Amino acid sequence: MATKPFFRRRKVCPFSGDNAPKIDYKDVRLLQRYISERGKIVPARITAVSAKKQRELAQAIKRARFLALLPYAVK
């Protein structure tokens, strides 16, 4: 008897939609959700962010790091 194939449900981008938050480099609380404990940017396949929004998110995180709002690395 063949087993039924397992289909993983596609996650929805948290930045697409009507009342989705805007990506802003000054919004440190929002950006910290997309940074690992070590300070690295979490990949889109884990956070389910679309490719376009992942680029915006990475740019905002890098900008916030440059302005010392976020750390480059956590020891």
Curated annotation (Swiss-Prot):
Recorded GO MF terms: small ribosomal subunit rRNA binding; structural constituent of ribosome
Source organism superkingdom: Bacteria
Similarity section: Belongs to the bacterial ribosomal protein bS18 family.
InterPro entries: Ribosomal_bS18, Ribosomal_bS18_CS, Ribosomal_bS18_sf
Entry protein name: Small ribosomal subunit protein bS18
One cellular component (GO) term of this entry: cytosolic small ribosomal subunit
Protein role: Binds as a heterodimer with protein bS6 to the central domain of the 16S rRNA, where it helps stabilize the platform of the 30S subunit.
UniProt cross-references to Pfam families, sorted A to Z: Ribosomal_S18
A biological-process GO annotation: translation
Self-association and partners: Part of the 30S ribosomal subunit. Forms a tight heterodimer with protein bS6.
Gene that produces this protein: rbsR
Signal peptide range: none
Keywords: Ribonucleoprotein, Ribosomal protein, RNA-binding, rRNA-binding
